[in-house]
Amino acid sequence: MRLLLVEDHVPLADELMASLTRQGYAVDWLADGRDAAVQGASEPYDLIILDLGLPGRPGLEILQEWRGLGLATPVLILTARGSWAERIDGLKAGADDYLTKPFHPEELALRIQALLRRAHGLANQSQLEAAGLRLDEQRQCVCLNGADVDLTAAEFRLLRYFMLHPGQVLSKGHLAEHLYDGETERDSNVIEVHVNHLRRKLGREVIETRRGQGYRYAGVAAG
């Protein structure tokens, strides 16, 4: 999952970048509101973390612009502004959630997970479950037939994206766009390598190949 972090306080941004990367997210960071307005509307992000007090352009104005353009990407406002009126303004502008600084890193992690599940119609789940597999996002492993299967960081990122899009045909290019940040060279052939690793661990039927199209997450057959 690819996230955009818009935060002008460098120490906090560095801390969040490190934490989110450990959680298996590909993260792009911007500190200027003008840059964020353009990149947030043009790149295929799965979620945006947006500070309100930004240089260049205020975060609330950017959010209103995105929603006016029809951008449906989940947006979590992360700000020191904690008054009730400002929370209302943020939610009215189109924010999906609002977290006031200071905050506990685990709360941010859980809110991000919940927003991503909700965005994919899985809001009623406390953990990510799809087609016979349950993903433990804290330990970055998957439960198969009652047993935990360890995953590498790359396998975890790829499987999480598949499980959030069950039944959808996803091209290598699409997967690369959502699994790597803007600074990483995107080699779609690497996707094939990680798919094969997941098949060896979970069974070949878990991820189908659609020739000329990409891959489809089918999960584990019941029984």
Swiss-Prot record:
Keyword DNA-binding: yes
KW Transcription regulation (keyword) present: yes
UniProtKB keywords: DNA-binding, Phosphoprotein, Transcription, Transcription regulation, Two-component regulatory system
Any Pfam family the entry gives: Trans_reg_C
GO molecular function: phosphorelay response regulator activity; transcription cis-regulatory region binding
Sites of 4-aspartylphosphate modification: D51
Listed GO biological process terms: regulation of DNA-templated transcription; response to calcium ion
One cellular-component annotation, GO: protein-DNA complex
Domain Response regulatory, first and last residues per copy: 2-116
Disruption phenotype: Abolishes Ca(2+)-dependent induction of CarP.
PANTHER family in alphabetical order: REGULATOR OF RPOS, RESPONSE REGULATOR PROTEIN CARR
Function: Member of the two-component regulatory system CarS/CarR that regulates the expression of multiple genes involved in calcium signaling and homeostasis including CarO and CarP. May function as a transcriptional activator by direct binding to a cis-acting sequence upstream of the target gene promoters.
Entry protein name: Response regulator protein CarR
The organism of origin for this protein: Pseudomonas aeruginosa (strain ATCC 15692 / DSM 22644 / CIP 104116 / JCM 14847 / LMG 12228 / 1C / PRS 101 / PAO1)
